């Protein structure tokens, strides 16, 4: 693939789209053959009418298509730009030769994914991926395939897209016409956004005005400052000497066209040379609208989406009488997209159309002929799910009409009588071909539309109105989709160019015929010049009925393809909210009682809209935190510790919820916490991550998830100065594992809850009633949730003895079915590593634990749903198992092992008399199952405090004990006490290590089982995929055989007709010979008749003579002595003789 180059003279004031990698070679498509279309006969035309084709054939075989001669040159469309490789039906971007595999989107660099207009590369359905080192362009087979690829790439770059606030920039623009340009020239425009070329118009010749009428729509744009339209003369190749082809430009600031309303006006063109004429110079009419759509996290739209999904019928019926047609269009568009993505589109359209049927009553001819929400909704749904069907059914036919000069004008007032017969023949041929394309497209008719039409038919049958179901289907499909697409292909993305006058007239006449065919109506007195098509209409009514029956047949729904495009649900919800908020605000301001009653009928919708509007205008601290934190998680891999990001959050006074300790009995606790407490935030993802040594330096966040910030309890702002103290030791995230090391000298362990929460989550304050005066309010983690304020009761002896048996990792169940944890390679945390770390941590525990105490311990256990349960360890003192080395500085990060969480010292909390349990604000949270036995706890505390009862201590001894409680023992005393404690519990630790090893083996076996199950599932999915592929191949083979059978049938019919014609010719020749023989006999008889006539004439004359002679003799009295004898000669003559 090469960089599309534009001649220098065409781009004096803008830069072109960035080039692509030079590693790819251009594969230009063959140029169109410009030979005219020829048709040997009617049946040949019908053979070309089948919709079925494969991508391995060119889209338009101009040597065999129907007769539309004099093709136009396509140079004005491609402008010599290299085209992308032509895709085949069996190829995919996933093939090994695809360039998608060459992209590395996980390096943290900014990546931009945007669609490319077809006028840039001369190829449809392309998109461009731009990154720091260059850019690449890719071509897809359809718009839906392109949209899905773009969305998948964007989610790879920004996995947290749905869970963060974002802005979507959308531009819709029409370049309509220009005036006052030089005549007899061809002109085109280039559309640039911030000096980057995004699209071109086609070339148009100047007449009175230059009319382009082309529409451009761009989504997911970067922030824009200006829209620039450059105008050029289209110089012919033979006249390249004229390099002055630049006309001028129009610059439109985006601020002037920003809003919900379109701005349409004439803009003066700025030319390189000032205009010296009297006129004001050239100008261009442009209609545009630029919108920045602010989209909140999907969580914010939950209630709104539920309301729309459940109450769409009420919403439409209430708003129908009070909103404009433009608002109806936008409302219908948003509702259709939202309900299609939520699976309710069929119910929505069925309910709306049936309400239309009830409203119209006996006047069912008005259905889909009014500007109602139902009409606009079915229009939008047809465009949404039927776009690819429209291209398959009519794309080639429309392109052929554009490229032909065939004249189909049949109005006698607009053409001569000598041309009328030919024009009528042309129109009839085009209508036959168009209808043949449509009725043969049933095999690719969208499944969703079949389901909707079948639902309409069933509802009409239930209501006893089955006679109008056919009218509903034909009116929606033809009146609102196919016929408008034939009349205006550019509005339905079939063609970019607006048709010229002759092509537009041809398309209009074809649409008239097809619409009358769908209505089962003939042409009447209004359009008498179209009456010659009535025979065609009557002949094709049967085919139309069969087509309507086929596309509404529920038995064939599973055999047809479905909608596979992408819908940005967040954007559609934001658009719908903006529209409804504007409408409801206007209604609420009205003084009319009807308008106020309308608002009241909407129920909770105004409040829901107001809440979303408040979130849009005033982002909450939670959203601000999430936005700040998302900056660290914009890519799947995050390097280094996240403690700096968290420290920034806690440096904000409004975000810190830590109380300063007030109670004198807890001053020692306050002091010790400031110096020694370590915090760790657990990742919110439900996926388990593999631990390795690399994880000590780098935390990897799973793709598609957001890290949940810690929940903070609600406190007073005046007590936030300890927030930074708590962060002396930074935080390390590793997967979803948890390790907490905290050293404290307080007396009891606070009750702990575990709250599983779904990602994403942010910090949120707890109920104010949970704040206890003088208590410490530390961070509470998502999984498990630690609260160090409320007292925890003691544990029975039976629970104490078996407490460590219940230890487990805090890892969540991942997508790989890992219940406990996952080990990887050479960095697995084995028990030897664990023992080594335990030995290394002995010196640390000697320095940082309070001697002469047996400290209870609480560790979380993660169940299958991500909830942690607390188990109490009696006589804990696990200093020997601490992981941090003795030289651990305040800036050191904690490390989470791959198998378990280790605590260096136990936690004890001062009991609070009225201390209520803090609860996470989650319905799934549950309390730790620890029984309340305070007496045992007090007894244990008294036993570990001192061999001497505190009541017998002197003031000096009590002071010394207080100092010791603050961790200020001498080094040798600490070591002595620690050694005694270690010796006492060494055997117990060995037992626990054995138990943990056994649990490790069990977990490993579970992991293997889960991997085996996953493999079986993958094999089943692969088998299912192969089965579907086989079914698809069978379907294609069946369709191919059907097509071959149709072709063979047509060929046999043609051969039979030719044979009949030959037989007729033979019969005709034989009859001609018989006729010739008969003619000869007739001629001979005629000659004999003529001779007999002449003989008869002579006979009569002889008789007359004899009669006269005889009469004379009688009168004279002379008797004839010798009578005259009459004799006949041999040749037939008479002779007189006398005796």
From Swiss-Prot:
Gene designation: RASAL2
One of the Pfam families matching this protein, by short name: DAB2P_C
GO molecular function, a single term: GTPase activator activity
Domain C2 per the UniProt entry, residue ranges: 149-267
Keywords: GTPase activation, Phosphoprotein
Positions bearing Phosphoserine: 16, 89, 663, 864
This protein's GO CC annotations: cytosol
The protein, known as: Ras GTPase-activating protein nGAP
GO biological process, one term: regulation of protein activation cascade
Protein species of origin: Homo sapiens (Human)
